[in-house]
Each structure stands twice: as C-alpha cells, then as structure tokens.
Amino acid sequence: MPSATGTKRVRGVSIFRPFVFGSEAQPFDPATKPSNVSSDHTHQWRVYVRGVNGEDISYWIKKVQFKLHETYVQNVRTVEHPPYEVTETGWGEFEIQIKIYFVPESMEKPQTLWHSLKLHPYGPDAEGKKERREVVVSQNYEEVVFNEPVEQFYDYLTGGSGTQQMQKGKSGKNAKQAQQQRGGRTAEIPFNETPENPYSRTAENKELDRLAEANKTVEQMIKDEKERLIAREKRLAELRASEGVPAQPLKKSFSGRIPVHSQQRMAGTVGPPDS
C-alpha cells in the first residue's frame, strides 16, 4: 500500500544537524545595576539554542521551550522565532529544561535537553575572572539525527535538492558535492574555530588526536601492569619453592557473569530514573 502524501520516507538515509545550547551569565556592577532589578539578584543571564557559528536552524526548528526554576513568573517560556533564547536575572544556579520542537513537516517528536545554569567562573583563573566580572559561558555542542526522514522534510534539510538527487541515483560523495554546488544546506561545521565559535573541524581533529594519545597511554599502562603482575607471580613462586610450600592452583579469571542470586538482589536498583 503506498504511503500517504507527505509521509513517504527516504529509506537508508540519516541526516544530522549540529547546534549549540547553553547559557551566558555576567555579574552586575553595583554602580550600574538597573534600578528595576531585584536587590538580591546578582547576575543577568541568557539561556539559548543556536546554530553552530551562527548557522540558521529555523528551517528545522519550529519552537523552543525553556522551563526555568518554579520561582520565576511564567517559568515556562516558549520562543517561536530566532533567536531562541530567554534573558533573565537571578542569584542562583539551577537546571533548565530545554525542549526543541521540530517543524511539522518532520513528523518527529520533540527532543528534551537539560542545561545547568552557571553563574560563577570555573576552570583556570576562576578568581581572576570573578574579579574582572567576565561573562561566564557554559555551552554544549549537540547533534540531532533524523533517521529516514520523510521526503518533504528531507528537501527542507537539503535545500530542496534532496529527493531529486535520490531519484537520479546519486549517493555518497557525489550527492554531497551536487548538493553543495546547488547551494543546498549542509551540516558542515567551519574548518577553523573563532573567538565566537570554538567548534570546528580543526578542533575536532585535535580532540581525536588527543583521545588517540590517551588510548595509547592507557594501553601502555595495562601492558606495564601485566608485566609487573607476571614478575610478582614468578617471584612468589620462587619464594614458595625455596620454603617448600606447595604451589597453589591458579585462580580462575572473572568471567563477567553475575550469579542468579546476585541478579535478583540487584533487581530494581539499575535502570532509568522514575518518570
């Protein structure tokens, strides 16, 4: 039976879109603090959802809902047009629920994220940043993946050239090049980072290199520890032999299996949090 209009999916295709969510906060200068701000509010802050390097994300996001602390008036704020952000003042840090609604053509369910609002500097030179009243930025890079999107949404994501390319049999690198030549939308992040945007392919490659080096270090540590263990066992065997102590049978290595009675005791303690 043919799919209903607008619900036919592009099989075997996954498309991702990167974005950034987070917050910026800055302490008030007592000399210039606005008079209409509550006396106990020490900071002005902004929570947001943005495209990487200012990329437009409004073609796949319908609206963003921010759920603030219950002490705020109308603590659930919905923003239907970019910039997707909420600006407020306050004195405390708390968790903010961010709910992203996709355009109706996507036929996708909303995605929920959580962000911890940071008001105070952290990391190197935290005290210096506090004295200088610098902006505290706390943000995360995220990617949303659309698996087998409906055709209409696929066209939205690719700038209108997606299904035409699929019909012509283009795939992989050729399809991507054709899309870029037609001016289609892409999910490519910038090659180099800037002061405003730390996310880039260069930074990504540096992070991959760092992880590779860390993996080598861990592997070497494991190798060294195994060699030390073998040497200790050999020395222990020599001491036992010199004292005439019978050699003990080798212990079986841990198989990774949990006894049935242990599984029963653990039941109910592992799993997703209560909804």
From Swiss-Prot:
GO terms for molecular function: histone binding. Residues 161-207, 239-275 are annotated as: Disordered. It is found in: Cytoplasm; Nucleus. Residues 9-160 form the YEATS domain. The keyword DNA repair applies. Its main location: cytoplasm. Component of the SWR1 chromatin-remodeling complex and of the NuA4 histone acetyltransferase complex. PANTHER family: PROTEIN AF-9 HOMOLOG (PTHR47573:SF1). Component of the SWR1 complex which mediates the ATP-dependent exchange of histone H2A for the H2A variant HZT1 leading to transcriptional regulation of selected genes by chromatin remodeling. Component of the NuA4 histone acetyltransferase complex which is involved in transcriptional activation of selected genes principally by acetylation of nucleosomal histones H4 and H2A. The NuA4 complex is also involved in DNA repair. Yaf9 may also be required for viability in conditions in which the structural integrity of the spindle is compromised. This is Protein AF-9 homolog. It comes from Emericella nidulans (strain FGSC A4 / ATCC 38163 / CBS 112.46 / NRRL 194 / M139) (Aspergillus nidulans). The gene is yaf9.
